[in-house]
Amino acid sequence: MAKAVVLLSGGLDSATAAAQAIADGYEAIALSFRYGQRHVRELEAARSVAAALGINQHFFVDVNIAQWGGSSLTDAAEPLPGSGVVAGEIPSTYVPGRNTVFIALALSLAEAQQASAIYLGINAVDYSGYPDCRPDYLAAFQQLASLSSKVGVEGQAPQLVAPLIHDHKVDIVRRAVVLGVPIPATWSCYAGGAEACGRCDSCRIRDRALIEAGYPEWATAIGRSLVSLQP
């Protein structure tokens, strides 16, 4: 069976991408990172998701890119966005170079494990301000993969697959349900804690999609109340 490395953060998008890789016939190898994020709740979710999907190989890598700051996801002194992302602006939750570092390490793992694909949960719709979630970024990295590795120069570079890149969050929820993703086990909240906050921008986008898709029971109580107040 062909292998695929899946970048698994523990969030809904990465979990759905992992499930898609399995549905596409790959043996999935999960890769998660301790990069200095505010909390480890998402890594606990990654473990749970990997187990639920039957992923046997799961690598955790320490790469503390948070130590030089630059993001509200890694710097507790910076407030988390909670009122929506301004169109055309890069959100404060962008972590400088994060996807570039992660995908580079995924390429290393894929080559070592002879994996023919790398599945990414990146999305260019809900977070269109992120420069490293765009199709042209992905295409450029694919070219780099072909030039920077032994398998690449031999014409067998792993294919970067981003099945959700053009999906709206509600479409991702629907796909996740079809693929059997354990949605309640995933974690998208920017804050840590026993339960998702329901206030940060990530929670709001997720809650709105869950409710629109017909699964309000998986949304936060705050998210359900906010939707009920809308005209």
Curated annotation (Swiss-Prot):
Alphabetical list of SUPFAM superfamilies matching this protein: Adenine nucleotide alpha hydrolases-like (SSF52402)
GO terms of biological process kind: queuosine biosynthetic process
Cofactor note: Binds 1 zinc ion per subunit.
Gene3D superfamilies, alphabetized: HUPs
Disulfide cysteine pairs (residue numbers): none
EC number(s) reported in the record: 6.3.4.20
Domain of life: Bacteria
UniProt: ATP binding residues: 8-18
Coiled coil spans: none
Keyword hit for Nucleotide-binding: yes
Binding sites annotated in the UniProt record for Zn(2+): 189, 197, 200, 203
Protein function: Catalyzes the ATP-dependent conversion of 7-carboxy-7-deazaguanine (CDG) to 7-cyano-7-deazaguanine (preQ(0)).
Family membership: Belongs to the QueC family.
Stated name of the protein: 7-cyano-7-deazaguanine synthase
Source organism (scientific name): Synechococcus elongatus (strain ATCC 33912 / PCC 7942 / FACHB-805) (Anacystis nidulans R2)
